[in-house]
Amino acid sequence: MDAVVSCQSNSFQPTDQELAEPSIHPSIDDLIALVRAQEDRIFSHARERAIDPLTLRTQLLLHLPRLVTADDFPDERDIQREILAVSDFLEERRLKYQPEYTQSLKQPERPLSLGDLEFGPLDENTAKMYHESFHYVGSYRPGRHFAFRDKNSGRIVCLGSVASFDLGHAEEKIAPDVDPRSVLMLSRFFAFRWAPENTFSHFHRKLRLQLIEEFDTKLMFSFINPNLGFNASSHKGAHWTLFAREAGTRYMYLDGRYRTMRFFVKNYGTSDAAKLKKKLGRSFEVSTIDLHPMWLLAIPLQRRARKAIPTIPYLFQRPELCASSSAKIFLDC
């Protein structure tokens, strides 16, 4: 799920570049439309493999950009091959986490309401299963984890994790008004399709109270990836604000599998594509299709943090990262 009702002029309006005339070259928006046009086929295949349909769709949107050339999209055969490859990976996760995986996909016996939900902490092992199996990034993010459970069955309805604030470029902007030590990142939010309406807003209210009470948190950030078709509607409903756009988005792959910047820095010491290509050779690939900037959203949890929110969103350039960097960094996409 993704999600600013704000009296400021700060909004989610597209940039001049995003409003430009369509390019003759394949665009990410065209790729999103292509995947949506095949949604019935994708969802049907997911049901046959007993994997989550939405996870398969978003994983395809992460993997297909590596097959886009300067002139054209992947052909029908390539798309089908990618559907099978991503499905194989997701099926591995299903088998790894049985029976919890299959049980999580089952519709509840009766529709749930917000009153059926109970907020509380989630242990690391359980969070890892949901991060790896159902969140579009597909990898575990360490931190503090919280969930809504059905009071009657104990089933997890949604979860979200918070991690330490590690955005050096954003810290420079907020430091005059907010102590960076009082800032957290909201990461890996996920809700099942059968979750009640407005689950994110309800979850955020509970999480906000928890973080203020436990950590005296004053400001929270979260990233949204519009290249997956996310429009931040849930965040808008929960009063998040567009703090910045981060240009330079690109996807990196190892042996055909999408991997995060965090993965490459942890395992190979850098996120610099040229250095990784030299180290890893043909097994390493980078998407060439132009991707929209990532959206960095923010929400003040206490009144004093409102001054840190810009009237006009900042524009950042995505940094190259290395393991020895002493600067705070963002490694999650």
What is the role of each PLM region?
Residues 39, 43-107:
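Charged, low-complexity intrinsically disordered segments and flexible loops
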Residues 156:
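Glycine-rich acetyl-CoA-binding "A-motif" of GNAT/NAT acetyltransferases
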Residues 143-145, 292-297:
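Short hydrophobic/aromatic beta-strand or adjacent loop that forms the aromatic wall/cage
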Residues 121, 142, 150-151, 163-285, ...:
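Acyl-donor binding region in acyl/amide transferases
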Residues 100-141:
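Short amphipathic alpha-helix that is part of the acyltransferase structural core
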Residues 159:
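Short glycine-/small-residue motifs
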Residues 2-8, 12-16, 20-52, 56-57:
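Intrinsically disordered, low-structural-confidence terminal and linker regions
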Residues 310-333:
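Short, cationic low-complexity segments
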